[in-house]
Every structure is written in structure tokens, then in C-alpha cells.
């Protein structure tokens, strides 16, 4: 299925299109997140958060500005940064 039509379906609220996109990108995104944070279970949780955020914010995606994968990575980087800030804060409280 062509990505353009999947994105349109996703913007229209089609859960099947979302599922297809999720299956298409989840492993690649999981590898990216794991590379950044070096924790497998946390990476899996963050990937879920990323896809939730993408689902909620799909209306902000503009195909003329970037690829969908770059949109995913942009959301991933925001979630990873938030995760890192929380981790640093937790580590400082423990010390």
C-alpha cells in the first residue's frame, strides 16, 4: 500500500492504516530508540509513546515538508529528550 494513502487514512482516523504503519516502522523505530537510550524494555515503552503521540498529532504532519519517517523521528527525539530529562532528575534525587 502506498504511504501517501496510508497517511491520508490515518488522518481520517482509519485504525487499519495506523496498524499497517505501526507494523511497518516499529522495529526500525525500536532500534533507533534503543541505540539512543541503551535499555531494551524502556525503548519498547517509548516506541509505544511515540506512536501514541504520532496518532494524536498526525494532523500536524505535512508531506510537503518531510517524509513520514522524519516526522516519526522528530516525535521520537522529543520523547527521548523528555525521557532523558526525567532520568537525570531521578538520578539526582537518588544521590
Question: Model segments located where?
Answer:
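Arg/Lys-rich amphipathic alpha helix in sigma70-family domain 2
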Residues: 60-63, 74-94
Amino acid at each position: 500500500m502506498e504511504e501517501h494513502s496510508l497517511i491520508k487514512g490515518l488522518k481520517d482516523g482509519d485504525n487499519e492504516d495506523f496498524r499497517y504503519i505501526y507494523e511497518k516502522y516499529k522495529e526500525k523505530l525500536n532500534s533507533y530508540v534503543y541505540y539512543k537510550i541503551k535499555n531494551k524494555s524502556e525503548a519498547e515503552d517509548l516506541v509505544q509513546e511515540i506512536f501514541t503521540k504520532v496518532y494524536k498529532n498526525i494532523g500536524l504532519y505535512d508531506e510537503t515538508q518531510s517524509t513520514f519517517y522524519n516526522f516519526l523521528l522528530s516525535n521520537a527525539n522529543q520523547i527521548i529528550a523528555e525521557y532523558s530529562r526525567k532520568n537525570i532528575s531521578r538520578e539526582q534525587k537518588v544521590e
